[in-house]
Amino acid sequence: MALLAVEGLRTQFATSGGTVRAVDGLSFAIERGEVLGLVGESGCGKSVTSLSIMRLVPPPGRVTAGRILLDGDDLLDKDAEAMRRVRGARIAMVFQEPMTALNPVFSIGDQIAAAVRAHEGGGRRAAWERAVEMLDRVQVPSPRERARDYPHQLSGGLRQRAMIALALAPGPQLLIADEPATALDVTIQAQILDLLRRLQADRGMAVLLITHDLGVVAELCHRVAIIYAGRIVEMAPVAKIFEEPLHPYTRGLLRCLPHPSRFGQPLSSIEGAPPDLRQAGAGCRFAPRCPLALESCRRDEPALDERRPGHFVACPVVSV
C-alpha cells in the first residue's frame, strides 16, 4: 500500500466570475521513502494540491470530489480536530515563504517546542531542548542562541532552515515542500536542497516536492508528475522525463531550459497562454497550444495511460 494515494481529487473556487476548477481529477501515489516532484507553470494547481492534502484550502475554495488516503485512511473523512492531529505528526509542510508561515510574535525555539509538545507531550524544558537539537540538525549556526531569535531577526536562508526544523520536529511520515528554495539566492538555494536531500535520506521519509524548477527535480526526485491546468499530463521516473519525454507540454518545458549548446540563440517558449480555468471546457486543456493537436483532442479528455512500464501520459497523439 502506498503511503499517500490521491484519487480523483477536485478542488474548486467559487468566484463572482465563475467556478475555478483549480485541481481537476488529479490521481497519484507516493511510496514510503520516495520523493515525487509535482511540476508545472505558475497557476497550474500545484500549491492548491498541497493545500488540499493538508486540508488547508482557504475560502472560497473547497475539495469537491476525490479521496486522499494516508496509509489507507481517507483524510477527507476526518473532522477538524482529527485533522489537527494528522498535521505535523504524520504530514508536515514547508511553505515557500517562511516569513509568512512563521509566527512573528514567538521565538523560533518556542514555535518548534510548541509543535513537539502538541504531538508528543512532555515538559517545556524537554521540548525546548528538542527545538535546539532540530535547529542543529538543519545546520543553523549557534542553535541555542538562534532558538531565542524571532523570525525577522534571521536571514531568508536561516528562516527556511527553521521552517524545515519546525516541520520535521514531530517526525512526520510525509513532508510536502512547496517551492522550498524559490525565494532564496542561488548559493543558499543549493544549501537548502542539499539539506532536504540529506534529511530525507537519513529519516527515510516520503517527500512531495512542488516546484516549477526542473533542475531541482533532477537533483532530488525519484519520479515526477507534470501538471497542466489542474490535470496531470505525464508521470514517470525522473530520468525518463528528461531523456524520453512523451507529452508535448513536457517536451515544450524541456526545450525552454537554457543549455550551453544553444549559447547565443533565442530561448524557446511555448506559444499561447494557459486556459482560463473558469471557462475550461471539454478535451485536453493543452490542445489550444499544442502543435500536434487533433480535432478529437479538443473534444475528448485524454486518459492518463501507462505507455511504458511506470511511464504514464495523457495524450492520444504521441507514439512510443
Say what each PLM segment does.
Residues 112, 164, 188, 192:
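Hydrophobic anchor residue at the start of the ABC signature
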